[in-house]
Amino acid sequence: MQSWSRVYCTLAKRGHFNRIAHGLQGVSAVPLRTYADQPIDADVTVIGSGPGGYVAAIKAAQLGFKTVCIEKNETLGGTCLNVGCIPSKALLNNSHYYHMAHGKDFASRGIEMSEVRLNLEKMMEQKSNAVKALTGGIAHLFKQNKVVRVNGYGKITGKNQVTATKADGSTEVINTKNILIATGSEVTPFPGITIDEDTVVSSTGALSLKKVPEKMVVIGAGVIGVELGSVWQRLGADVTAVELLGHVGGIGIDMEVSKNFQRILQKQGFKFKLNTKVIGATKKSDGNIDVSIEAASGGKAEVITCDVLLVCIGRRPFTQNLGLEELGIELDPRGRIPVNTRFQTKIPNIYAIGDVVAGPMLAHKAEDEGIICVEGMAGGAVHIDYNCVPSVIYTHPEVAWVGKSEEQLKEEGIEYKVGKFPFAANSRAKTNADTDGMVKILGQKSTDRVLGAHIIGPGAGEMINEAALALEYGASCEDIARVCHAHPTLSEAFREANLAASFGKAINF
């Protein structure tokens, strides 16, 4: 549990931020800049309006800083809102409904439908409307918080200067006390394979296909690969994912959960070729694509033919033409911007957060860094425990985890205990006829402290936040087990798993 000294410290910091906010000058009332000869003066200039950038800009303005946010695209929100998290979740949700209606699921619930048809155009329209509403929402929040928005490509042209260049070549200069780089990431290209966003697509193109592929090959069975692959598999495509690693779900996933996840996806019709590498891809005259693969350890090559090839081998930091070289800021071997614990680069008033720095490329991680970074600019404490940052795969069932996996605990030599509870024994999952998966809790053997939580099943993405809170506050498995959970709810499975971890036995299993 949180100590009283930590509570007092937190309250003191809040008071410190309030005093700073009242002491600073008011922010600009101009929500959108047009291009002019007169430079803008700012306290904080944020380059990029993705989850990290726009949240940091709003927080900076709320703390009393005169804040500018530069965005090269017409809409705010970055990759996440425009061609990432948000549109993909719309398609994941709606394709799941279609799959339930088109298969035997609805019939088993007493819902009989004579004909179920897919209107892909309408599904894409709903996705686009969700994106439009949310990106417009950020613009409204900027106006509400008096964040000055500048359209253009931001480049750092001096220690205290950023120049935004518009598509027509016109420029705007911002003289600023602090600069925050939040330019995000871009799709990692596959050597020898050219993405045309038509038949050879990245995650961006996979969100806007004009028709359901007959056969789709996905290079990579990590988070993005299985999410987008499952969308098109549910809508009727024959989908095969080729993965260099020996498991699905990417780095960080617990291996027991990964095996269960693969089994469930295969039961749904998703195919996998693990421990397999892609050698190349060739477009044929009939429009199809031959994908050459072989075992990761080497061996005889095999060819898989598809009409759509989806490349999902990860993302890389986007730092092109930011002016870093001229400032003497060198990137690390993975193309990331080195920063200290306060997110400062080697130039103290130039900061970087999100996908351009080390750590998982997650929207919520970038948001946290953005808030804490600008609080640091205002003189506050800066601390993030990356062990408490959750990860979610938004398939059905969902997969989510936070903290350590069994593999990590074994590698670190930490003695631990395990508590599990299957959704098949959860009353709400039973009534919903959605019982695949389990909750798995890892606790420290000597102290009972929660070290990790791994969930596969309905509502995993929502439930994992309870685990993140427990980790952040240093809760024990018993602490969670003694919290009364509403009945009947899926989250009772989380309590039961903690009962199993702390006392050696769950109640309902």
Curated annotation (Swiss-Prot):
The modification N6-succinyllysine is found at K66, K104, K122, K132, K143, K159, K166, K273, K277, K410, K430, K505. Keywords: Acetylation, Cell projection, Cilium, Cytoplasmic vesicle, Disulfide bond, FAD, Flagellum, Flavoprotein, Mitochondrion, NAD, Nucleus, Oxidoreductase, Phosphoprotein, Redox-active center, Transit peptide. Its cofactor is FAD. InterPro entries: Class-I_Pyr_Nuc-Dis_Oxidored (IPR050151), FAD/NAD-bd_sf (IPR036188), FAD/NAD-binding_dom (IPR023753), FAD/NAD-linked_Rdtase_dimer_sf (IPR016156), Lipoamide_DH (IPR006258), Pyr_nuc-diS_OxRdtase (IPR001100), Pyr_nucl-diS_OxRdtase_dimer (IPR004099), Pyr_OxRdtase_I_AS (IPR012999). Tyrosine phosphorylated. The modification Phosphoserine is found at S285, S297, S502. GO terms for biological process: 2-oxoglutarate metabolic process; pyruvate metabolic process. It is an enzyme of class 1 (oxidoreductase). The record marks D448, Y473 as: Important for interaction with PDHX and activity of pyruvate dehydrogenase complex. NAD(+) binds at G220, A221, G222, V223, I224, G225, V226, E227, E243, V278, G314. It comes from the Eukaryota. FAD binds at residues 71-80, 89, 154, 183-185, 355, 361-364. The modification N6-acetyllysine is found at K66, K104, K122, K132, K143, K346, K410, K417, K420, K505. Residues 1-35 form a transit peptide. Its EC number is 1.8.1.4. Belongs to the class-I pyridine nucleotide-disulfide oxidoreductase family. Homodimer. Part of the multimeric pyruvate dehydrogenase complex that contains multiple copies of pyruvate dehydrogenase (subunits PDHA (PDHA1 or PDHA2) and PDHB, E1), dihydrolipoamide acetyltransferase (DLAT, E2) and lipoamide dehydrogenase (DLD, E3). These subunits are bound to an inner core composed of about 48 DLAT and 12 PDHX molecules (by non covalent bonds). The 2-oxoglutarate dehydrogenase complex is composed of OGDH (2-oxoglutarate dehydrogenase; E1), DLST (dihydrolipoamide succinyltransferase; E2), DLD (dihydrolipoamide dehydrogenase; E3) and the assembly factor KGD4. Lipoamide dehydrogenase is a component of the glycine cleavage system as well as an E3 component of three alpha-ketoacid dehydrogenase complexes (pyruvate-, alpha-ketoglutarate-, and branched-chain amino acid-dehydrogenase complex). The 2-oxoglutarate dehydrogenase complex is mainly active in the mitochondrion. A fraction of the 2-oxoglutarate dehydrogenase complex also localizes in the nucleus and is required for lysine succinylation of histones: associates with KAT2A on chromatin and provides succinyl-CoA to histone succinyltransferase KAT2A. This is Dihydrolipoyl dehydrogenase, mitochondrial. It comes from Sus scrofa (Pig). The lineage of its organism: Eukaryota, Metazoa, Chordata, Craniata, Vertebrata.
